[in-house]
Amino acid sequence: MAAPTLLTYGTGNVDETLTLAMTNMIPGIKDNIFNENTALGWFYSTGKEEKKGGASLSHGVQYAKSTSGGSYSRYGQMITTPQDNKTRDQWPWKQYYWNVSIDGFTERIAGGGDNAIEDALQEKRDEAEMTMKDRLEIDIFKSSPATDDLRSLPNLVLGSGTEGQINGTNNSWWQSNVLTAGSWATGVGRTQLTNACNTASKRNPTGPVECLMSDQTSVEAYESTLVAQYRYTTNKADIGLTKLLFKEIPWLWSVQANSGVIYGLHSKAIKFYVHSGTDFKFTGFYPANAAGQDAKVGQILLAAALTTPIRRKLFKTTANAA
C-alpha cells in the first residue's frame, strides 16, 4: 500500500486562520456506502437458531399421512400394514470470512497518542463486519449460489429442484407455492398475493406467514394502491405510509431483493442456523511476518446455514409490477 496522503501545507495553502486555529475534527465515521440489510436482520431477529456443532444440519421430515387405520365392527379385519412416512434432509455448514488488517504506522505512530481521532483497530473491525453483512444479504437473494455460499431464497422458495438433498421436482410435498402475478394497478398482483397467503395459512404450522419480503418496486406498487384510501380515512394530506402490512402480515423490502418477487416467510419453515462459536467471531490479530510486513491481520468468521424444514409453507409471487 502506498504512503499516506497528507494535507498540503505552506503559504499557498495555510493562512493565519488555519495557523492559529485547529480544524474541529468531529468524531465518528459517517457511513456513505453501506445499505440496510433487511433480510439478514429478519433472519437474525426471527429465524435465527444457534447450534454448537455437527458436521452438517438435519431435520426430521414428515412426508405422508398414515393410512393404517379406519372403522371396523366386531370381528372385522384391521389393517396392520406398517408404514414409513418420515425421512431426513441435510444441510452443510457454510463458512464466511472477512480480513481485518492494519499497518504498524497507522496503529502505533499516526493513530497513537492524543492526535488519534478514532480507534483505528475498532474502525477496521466495524468496516469488515458491515462489508460481510452486505455480502450475506447479497447471497440470500443470489439466483445461482456458489458451492460455498448460503442456499438462497430464489432456490429454497421454488416449486422444483433438490434442496437439503430432497428432490422437490419429484416430491410435491417438498415444493413451495410459486405464482405468477402482474400489475397491482389492475388488481392481479393483489389477487395472486392474497391466494398465496391463504394457501400458506392452511399448511402446518397453522396460521399465516410471518413476513413478506420483496424489492422496493413491489412495495411501492402495493403502496400506490393504498394511498388514496389512506388519505380518505385519515383526513390528512399524506402521500405515504410508514408501516406496511398485507393481511396483517409485516411487509419488508431489501435493496438486494429479486426484482418483482414477493416472498412469504415463516420462522418455522425457514431457519437461519448460526454456529454459536463462529457467529461473527474475531480471530484476533496476528503479525503478518510471513510477508515481511510491519502489519497485523485477523479475520471475522461466520459459520451458518440457510435451510427450510417445511418447504411447502413458503411461497413467492413473481412478475409483480405497478
Task: Give the label of every model feature segment.
Residues A2-A322:
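Flexible, glycine/threonine- and acidic-rich loop/arm segments that mediate assembly and lattice contacts
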